[in-house]
Amino acid sequence: MQKFIIHKGIACPLEYANIDTDQIIPKQFLLAVSKQGFGKHLFHDLRYLDDKESVLNMDFNLNKKEYQNSSILVSFENFGSGSSREHAPWALVDYGIRAIIAPSFADIFKNNALGNGLLTIELAKDEVLGIVDELKKSQDKNIEISLLEKRVFFKDKIFSFDLDDFHRICLLEGLDNIALTLKHEAQIKAYEKNSKSFLV
């Protein structure tokens, strides 16, 4: 998992509330078990005008020239609602999204996202609306995020956010669940060696 310490990138506003996991990655693309390859299907029904993904919907912000190569999304409340599919953060990360800013997230999506290196940042609704409004007006679409300081820097404004210490450390060190387990491999092996074996 890629470390997240400081990131600066183009931010794209998605002015929708209650974006659910089926909108993020529709069910017909969930057959694969690898984390790679889902990015091209991200927001399929919003990004494309046809099922073959050959005609882009140019009214959708991610398809607009000024938001190409976006690595930050700014959206509205309850982002990631719906089913618990982990493919949703996989698709976002595979596309190149490093962080999402919103007033609130669905709990399961938030945990899945953080566990896959995708930073979820909760700001007050009026702060999010202000950022979205400024992104739409300004030529400079870049936002800087410091996980070390737990701050978002945009234009002349600074926004503070909270994140629990466990997920913050995992993101700073680039530790997913497997890497976190392997970090304690020596202790696990010592425990197994010293534990009694029981035969059934």
UniProtKB/Swiss-Prot annotation:
GO terms for biological process: L-leucine biosynthetic process. It catalyses: (2R,3S)-3-isopropylmalate = (2S)-2-isopropylmalate. Pathway: Amino-acid biosynthesis; L-leucine biosynthesis; L-leucine from 3-methyl-2-oxobutanoate: step 2/4. One of its GO terms (cellular component) is 3-isopropylmalate dehydratase complex. One of its GO terms (molecular function) is 3-isopropylmalate dehydratase activity. SUPFAM superfamilies: LeuD/IlvD-like. Its EC number is 4.2.1.33. The keyword Amino-acid biosynthesis applies. Gene3D superfamilies: Aconitase, domain 4. Keywords: Amino-acid biosynthesis, Branched-chain amino acid biosynthesis, Leucine biosynthesis, Lyase. Belongs to the LeuD family. LeuD type 1 subfamily. Heterodimer of LeuC and LeuD. Catalyzes the isomerization between 2-isopropylmalate and 3-isopropylmalate, via the formation of 2-isopropylmaleate. PANTHER family: 3-ISOPROPYLMALATE DEHYDRATASE SMALL SUBUNIT, 3-ISOPROPYLMALATE DEHYDRATASE SMALL SUBUNIT 2-RELATED-RELATED. This is 3-isopropylmalate dehydratase small subunit. The lineage of its organism: Bacteria, Pseudomonadati, Campylobacterota, Epsilonproteobacteria, Campylobacterales.
